[in-house]
Amino acid sequence: MATAATAAAALTGATTATPKSRRRAHHLATRRALAAPIRCSALSRATPTAPPATPLRPWGPNEPRKGSDILVEALERCGVRDVFAYPGGASMEIHQALTRSPVIANHLFRHEQGEAFAASAYARSSGRVGVCIATSGPGATNLVSALADALLDSVPMVAITGQVPRRMIGTDAFQETPIVEVTRSITKHNYLVLDVDDIPRVVQEAFFLASSGRPGPVLVDIPKDIQQQMAVPAWDTPMSLPGYIARLPKPPATEFLEQVLRLVGESRRPVLYVGGGCAASGEELCRFVELTGIPVTTTLMGLGNFPSDDPLSLRMLGMHGTVYANYAVDKADLLLAFGVRFDDRVTGKIEAFAGRAKIVHIDIDPAEIGKNKQPHVSICADVKLALQGMNTLLEGSTSKKSFDFGSWHDELDQQKREFPLGYKIFNEEIQPQYAIQVLDELTKGEAIIATGVGQHQMWAAQYYTYKRPRQWLSSAGLGAMGFGLPAAAGAAVANPGVTVVDIDGDGSFLMNIQELAMIRIENLPVKVFVLNNQHLGMVVQWEDRFYKANRAHTFLGNPENESEIYPDFVAIAKGFNIPAVRVTKKSEVHAAIKKMLEAPGPYLLDIIVPHQEHVLPMIPSGGAFKDMILDGDGRTVY
């Protein structure tokens, strides 16, 4: 296979190509040649080998270049192949340097929030660090929601922002915002680079911080004069994170793992409660379940970490979880909480949650242990290592023979039969649950699903079959509307050739609808699946249940003509040159979804659904399992 250097050398011999075409050809050839991504070293120094010299980079290894070029080279050394960047005055030096990169492709979203959500989904769906770049001032502040989202959902991201020149910092200069201060509480760490020689070290540290321990977002703010300053990069500068590295969790001790297995052996009704912290541990988790026979329920972030079609799957628990998952946790005598944080949407009334159970909590973040629910046994460690250790102990002993949870399985199977997920059918009205079931059937549960936030998000969690980690992409902790479309685009960039569907609501979709331009220009095969009820459906559901159906600004259509579908998403999509179809009858759904999936490139399907439908089951906020609501909808007076 050709190396990056030989690919570059072959291109340097082309004397008739224009600089623009040569740059494009060089970029494509080099990307194809790079079969294995370069990884930023965790505890060792970055590779001393300079990127291949090309006509785009006329300097030698020991010759000065701009700080912006040093930044881009540092990104390359950390394995970056895709960035999501929108240019502006304080970041244009970085964009100029990106045009000189033979490796990195920029994906031009139409809003900084969109690009940052895309970077988040890129990371969620691939496990690689997502990178977004914005200019100073409003460009930087437009990243804020996505950074807060990434912190709550433990997503490895590096956000790079341009800043006004150093001499202007603090003068209220044009487009100056103290973004380090703004983001201090919504990032894992952040930097203001004041010395061009710090760029190689800072970038290496940023990627290490973002991806190690509990992952999270890191922001790097770089003044424009630093970007323009000439310097010779010192690639062998080591990281300087002694305190952080010393506090990283160690591999779990065998005696603690043996204690957990003893509790499993003593239990009769154990339940595994699995969250987003198990995203990298799917194989180990499945093996642990195979060895023990413990039923599994997942959080919203944990969907796909254990196959939801497995006989031992209880699917999702919590506010809109299944009856049988919440029943299992309520009746359990042992709760194994792996990679979770006992979020309020899961636990409801915290005192009543798993009230009969001994609790084992394994998490990589010591701050989460005992924060909301005090465990009986806690292990601060990487869940993957803990599962590997317990599997090794189980495989090397006869402990497995002592696990007999047959009667517990029978009890839960009875709950599944008595309380399956379900919905009512009203003639030709399209029930949103039905539309998702058809999508699941036609994709065989293999698509990557991104969502916005609202009722459609919960129905997508309930009615699609998730079979593997990183298949489900949603703003869980922050609940940020507008996540779905840019997230689907970011996932499509990270996973070429994989079907990606944005299951969205009309409210969420409209918040970042401008990214239709991006998916059309890059011809990404993103399928936009809008469940359009002309309302903020989840808020309407709460109005119905708790506010006597008093509508307080939740109708999103045209109040002068409520029968009109407004806005016209089909017309808007066609304005972006994206094929689109609207369906209003149940009998049209199967053929319409099939056509959407078979169409090359992007496609929008506008599915008109009733606004009276409610997401059920539902445990009211602050309630317990005994308070679960199982029936009713907006057609009922409460």
Curated annotation (Swiss-Prot):
SUPFAM superfamilies: DHS-like NAD/FAD-binding domain (SSF52467), Thiamin diphosphate-binding fold (THDP-binding) (SSF52518). Residues 1-39 form a transit peptide. Its main location: plastid. Mg(2+) binds at residues 506, 533. One of its GO terms (cellular component) is acetolactate synthase complex. Disulfide bonds join 132-278. Binds 1 Mg(2+) ion per subunit. One of its GO terms (molecular function) is magnesium ion binding. Thiamine diphosphate binds at residue 112. Its cofactor is Mg(2+); thiamine diphosphate. GO terms for biological process: isoleucine biosynthetic process; L-valine biosynthetic process; response to herbicide. Residues 44-67 are annotated as: Disordered. It is found in: Plastid, Chloroplast. InterPro entries: Acetolactate_synth_lsu, AHAS_TPP, DHS-like_NAD/FAD-binding_dom, THDP-binding, Thiamin_PyroP_enz_cen_dom, Thiamin_PyroP_enz_TPP-bd_dom, TPP_enz, TPP_enzyme_TPP-bd. Its EC number is 2.2.1.6. It catalyses: 2 pyruvate + H(+) = (2S)-2-acetolactate + CO2. CDD domains: TPP_AHAS (cd02015), TPP_PYR_POX_like (cd07035). Residues 455-535 are annotated as: Thiamine pyrophosphate binding. It holds the Pfam family TPP_enzyme_M. NCBIfam families: acolac_lg. Acetolactate synthase is the target enzyme for sulfonylurea and imidazolinone herbicides. Belongs to the TPP enzyme family. This is Acetolactate synthase 2, chloroplastic. It comes from Zea mays. The gene is ALS2.
